């Protein structure tokens, strides 16, 4: 068994945060620590955290990348799990996370898909049939391993130590999960578990503006990553390491 911290970055999303925290309170395997990273909320996020009895950390540096990294830095457990504010994990989510990562070893991460709720029927269809599969396969092909999906992933603390100094904390328009995925070194294995699912809000797909914003952040993230290491060079480096160490 391992200890588990759950990190939830948030900003002005008190209502879905309360639902997420209620879902965590119903886990068959309770978290050892829940950290809500408040990135400048002006609503009643602080009151929601106090009522749930979870730790709230205020972060002034704007952007989800800064908030997530701070939460991971503060986590004190052997496994660090990540949810979005509107994620709704099923009751056995942490139990599954612990079992997978305890089997997988000390330098591992695991991610899974989302089941979209709310929003429009088209938005739910778009998220479940285009966005998640496209992200999984297109970004996975680019990386040479599965990507992390920010609404639903976890990693061992040792894996975070490998990338914490490399992530782009000071770039507000960067997708933190995509950035972390790109910074994962060859010695860290990433697993994709289709059965490890959480509820995810379909609201980002309710309008072309919201969907376009997500795509814009993705392109910005790719531009930042490619300047530091082109994808082909990254894949070759990972391939060389795998040939040497995973025979």
Model-derived regions, located:
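Short, flexible, basic/aromatic active-site loop/helix in glycosyltransferases
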Residues: 112-118, 125-146
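Short, acidic, metal-binding catalytic loop of nucleotide-sugar glycosyltransferases
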Residues: 23-31
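Acidic donor-binding loop at a coil-to-helix junction in glycosyltransferase catalytic cores
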Residues: 171-180
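A conserved acidic beta->alpha catalytic loop
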Residues: 23, 38-46, 87
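Acidic helix N-cap motif at the loop->helix transition within catalytic regions
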Residues: 15-18, 43-51
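Conserved donor NDP-sugar-binding/catalytic core segment of glycosyltransferases
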Residues: 92-123
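Glycine-rich, basic loop-to-helix element that forms the pyrophosphate-binding segment
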Residues: 59-75
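Short beta-strand-to-loop acidic/aromatic patch adjacent to the donor-nucleotide binding site
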Residues: 78-88
């Amino acid at each position: 068994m391992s200890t588990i911290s759950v990190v939830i970055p948030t900003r002005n999303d008190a209502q879905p945060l309360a639902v997420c925290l209620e879902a965590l309170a119903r886990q068959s395997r309770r978290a050892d620590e829940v950290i809500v990273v408040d990135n400048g909320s002006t609503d009643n996020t602080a009151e929601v955290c106090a009522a749930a009895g979870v730790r709230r950390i205020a972060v002034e540096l704007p952007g989800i990348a800064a908030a997530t990294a701070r939460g991971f830095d503060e986590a004190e457990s052997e496994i660090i799990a990540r949810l979005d504010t509107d994620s709704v994990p099923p009751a056995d989510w942490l139990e599954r996370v612990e079992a997978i990562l305890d089997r997988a070893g000390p330098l591992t991460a695991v991610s899974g898909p989302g089941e979209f709720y709310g929003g429009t029927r088209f938005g739910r269809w778009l998220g479940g049939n285009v966005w998640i599969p496209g992200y999984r396969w297109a970004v996975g092909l680019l990386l040479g391993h599965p990507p992390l999906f920010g609404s639903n992933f976890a990693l061992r603390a040792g894996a975070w130590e490998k990338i914490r100094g490399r992530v782009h904390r000071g770039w507000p328009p960067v997708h933190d999960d995509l950035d972390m995925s790109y910074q994962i070194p060859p010695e860290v294995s990433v697993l994709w578990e289709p059965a490890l699912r959480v509820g995810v809000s379909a609201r980002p797909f309710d309008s072309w503006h919201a969907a376009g914003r997500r795509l814009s952040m993705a392109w910005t993230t790719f531009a930042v990553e490619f300047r530091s290491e082109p994808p082909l060079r990254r894949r070759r480096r990972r391939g060389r390491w795998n040939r040497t160490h995973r025979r």
